[in-house]
């Protein structure tokens, strides 16, 4: 069941069309990637879901009903442009933002202390925000986004500015929050993160929805019938009947890694059967799916 449904959403800013009849179904308890080049309309859609901006037409449903301002309290939003008040102490800032989301002072303090301890930043409580580095401030803002245990989290470029260690920390937290039942909208240009984290995606370009669906389904849809065969043995692959062409075949001390282009769809089992008839040992045989980065470039270029 879709937790968030965007139905025929349109939004204009004067003569500029930001979203043109865009419909999305965001499943409950999954990570949904909202993708697109700069200026495609992603941020506008995020702001509409958050009720920061009102659409010209169309509607957003939250758990099957029109979204209300009360529902917004159940959303945790990490914008791409971070916005902590630089002159405030970190603890005061975090308390203020948590209480804006409906938490009592007691609950906010207790939950924030847990998160600060978890991230190893408990000694930052009395620091001014302006004393923090960009990465340190982003840790604090991530905590303020999730501290009220939102049922929906919207994370816009959450890994931007983090070093690899802290990016991995945030990645693990996102997956843990998903395991706890949260729904996550992840807006990012990092296609590796999309492949690793997202269950489903939608790609928007020039204010239109280009494609939506499961990540693996989309990768298979744009597949090119290539497979990787790792084997040991001296029988040349050319001895196998013509079910494929050989793109590459490297030999490392008798262990071969070959990339094969199959002659048609659904021939993988046939190829494996014929290869096994030769005097070789098959170590692995897998489909090579295109990367999301390549699919992104292809679709954005085609719809430019």
Residue ranges of model-derived segments:
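Short, charged/small-residue-rich alpha-helical element at the C-terminal edge
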Residues: 226-299, 304
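Residues that scaffold the ATP/ADP-binding catalytic core of kinase and kinase-like folds
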Residues: 70, 145, 218-221, 295, ...
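Residues at or immediately preceding the N-termini of alpha-helices
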Residues: 105, 215, 265-268
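ABC transporter nucleotide-binding domain
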Residues: 172-261
